[in-house]
């Protein structure tokens, strides 16, 4: 628990509110060697970095495929868990029989980090990749007085329950692996990898990774502001962008977002169907008004508000409310496209940035100053 008190002073929000809202940006090493946040404006930098890495025989790492790919904040998240279980109690995936437990997810990553710490320290000292560190290297480092630490009794590179209970710096009950197995949150033949290994599959089973709805209930309930959702998205990004490993259903959604601008693949011309039957006209920017400067508000309808039957009722109600209140507004019509949030939550950060950049251009051209939204 030694990390608890400094951790609670490092809130992401300057207002010290819960870390809900936008996901953390995807950070990559730019062509100048500096960490660069991926945005629609830095996509060219990512292309240049990937070309430079390919020429040098390396690669640009996107997302967290190994424990060392997490930021210091991510690693601190894992070490600060108090094991209160509030996140698990409120998790909709856990409460509907899915294998995901936010608590066990964090503890598995924490225990893996504690187990592979000797390999990470040795790799840094010897200038090699953690996967290249051998038992002989560890023995030499230990003989030379290197601060390695060591789990005992590993079996085939996996940590036993007793090992996890002895892991340096891990403050847990000592039976996390037993809890993971009982919850079916870890495959019986795997456990928690005690050697450097890919996170997806070796530490976090695929079913666990893709069961998260990214609702944020775990973050909202956490007394120390651990950002479970961002850690899930970090691993998903690596799986989607580096491994192309994701549920088949997401492939269809990605294609529809890219080609049609909405998750269902419906035609853009149907975006105004929600307004049929209203006793007043809904002005469309570029058709009925030149730009948003001619009205009080731009009404951003969103994909669900335009296409989904239940959400259409909400859209109509908001439009009627604005009309009754005498507030002038206009919509973008078929110029509107998805915000890209579904792609971002699923780990496809590049598609998200493409859609976000497109929307920024659209809103800039529309001269939007004040926007009303109903989409979540």
Predicted stretch roles:
Residues 3-10, 49, 53:
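Short, small-residue-biased leader/transition segments that mark boundaries at the very start
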Residues 9, 23-26:
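Active-site loops and adjacent core secondary-structure elements that bind or stabilize anionic groups
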Residues 13:
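Phosphate-binding active sites in nucleotide-utilizing proteins
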Residues 17, 51, 55, 59, ...:
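Juxtamembrane inter-helical linkers in multi-pass membrane proteins
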Residues 30-33, 50-51, 57-100, 204, ...:
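Non-transmembrane accessory domains of multi-pass membrane transporters/channels
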Residues 35-54:
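Vicinal oxygen chelate
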Residues 69-72, 78, 100-104, 113-374:
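Iron-sulfur-cluster electron-transfer modules
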Residues 85, 93-95, 109, 226, ...:
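Active-site proximal loops enriched in glycine and acidic residues that flank catalytic Cys/His/Asp
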């Amino acid at each position: 628990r030694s990390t608890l008190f400094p951790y609670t002073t490092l809130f992401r929000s300057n207002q010290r509110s819960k870390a809900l809202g936008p996901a953390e940006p995807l950070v990559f090493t730019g062509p100048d060697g500096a960490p660069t946040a991926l945005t629609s404006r830095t996509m060219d930098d990512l292309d240049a970095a990937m070309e430079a890495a390919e020429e040098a025989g390396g690669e640009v790492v996107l997302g967290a495929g190994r424990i060392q790919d997490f930021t210091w904040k991510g690693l601190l998240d894992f070490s600060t868990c108090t094991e209160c279980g509030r996140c698990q109690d409120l998790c909709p995936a856990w409460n509907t029989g899915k294998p995901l437990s936010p608590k066990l997810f964090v503890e598995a990553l924490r225990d893996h980090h504690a187990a592979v710490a000797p390999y990470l320290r040795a790799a840094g000292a010897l200038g090699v990749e953690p996967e290249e560190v051998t038992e002989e290297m560890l023995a030499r480092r230990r003989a030379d007085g290197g601060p390695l630490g060591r789990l005992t009794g590993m079996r085939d590179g996996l940590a036993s329950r007793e090992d996890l209970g002895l892991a340096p710096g891990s403050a847990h009950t000592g039976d996390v692996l037993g809890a993971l197995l009982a919850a079916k949150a870890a495959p019986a033949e795997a456990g928690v990898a005690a050697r450097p290994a890919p996170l997806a599959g070796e530490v976090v089973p695929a079913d666990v990774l893709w069961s998260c709805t990214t609702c944020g209930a775990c973050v909202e309930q956490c007394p120390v502001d651990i950002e479970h959702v961002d850690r899930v998205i970090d691993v998903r990004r690596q799986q989607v962008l580096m491994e192309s490993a994701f549920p088949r259903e997401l492939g269809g959604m990605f294609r529809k977002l890219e080609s049609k601008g909405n998750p269902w693949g419906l035609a853009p011309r149907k975006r105004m169907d929600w307004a049929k039957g209203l006793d007043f006209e809904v002005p469309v920017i570029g058709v009925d008004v030149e730009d948003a400067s001619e009205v009080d508000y731009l009404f951003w309808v969103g994909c669900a508000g335009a296409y989904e039957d239940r959400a259409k009722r909400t859209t109509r109600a908001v439009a009627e409310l604005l009309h009754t209140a005498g507030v002038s507004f206009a919509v973008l019509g078929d110029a509107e496209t998805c915000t890209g949030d579904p792609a971002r939550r699923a780990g496809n950060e590049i598609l998200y940035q493409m859609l976000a950049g497109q929307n920024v251009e659209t809103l800039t051209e529309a001269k939007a100053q004040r926007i009303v939204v109903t989409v979540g």
